[in-house]
Amino acid sequence: MTKLMNRDEFRAALENAIKGKSANKAPFSVAWATGRLSRAHLARWAENHYHYVGPFADYLGYLYARTPAHMVEAKDFLLANMYEEEIGGDRHTDLLIRFAEACGTTKERVIDPDNMSPTTRGLQAWCYSVAMREDPVVAVAGLVVGLESQVPSSYRKQTPTV
């Protein structure tokens, strides 16, 4: 039987698995980082990103409810992440709305679920599905390591051009 990895080994293996697949290398991210996007592009991005980021605490809440009670550290991690998403400092959705408005769109367009693109709707559905159906370890790997952990490095590359 294969030996289970400890937490640090598992995290390193996950990070190695996504190397070379970073959101930083996506054409949109590259265009943003090099200053080739218009305010209209950024407004549309914010209108869509809101619908992925907005329910992130909900995804984590579903996952928290399904995480076995004996996984206390994992449950604490999920609670801390939910707190940070919703209460700890500026709410991410509020920041997105302000950014979107600065780019020329309205709060009404940002929060309107009928305004999100089919791709964003698919990403949101995938996030809910993973949170509700996958093993908690798989769900954390996909949602937190695979998606959420890429956002800060993307923003570091994009912020100077804004």
Which residue ranges define each predicted feature?
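Intrinsically disordered, low-complexity regions
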Residues: 1-2, 34
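Alpha-helical bundle segments that constitute or directly flank the non-heme di-iron/ferroxidase center
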Residues: 17-23, 32, 36-69, 84-91, ...
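Active-site-proximal alpha-helical scaffolds that flank and shape metal-associated catalytic sites
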Residues: 2, 7-11, 73-162
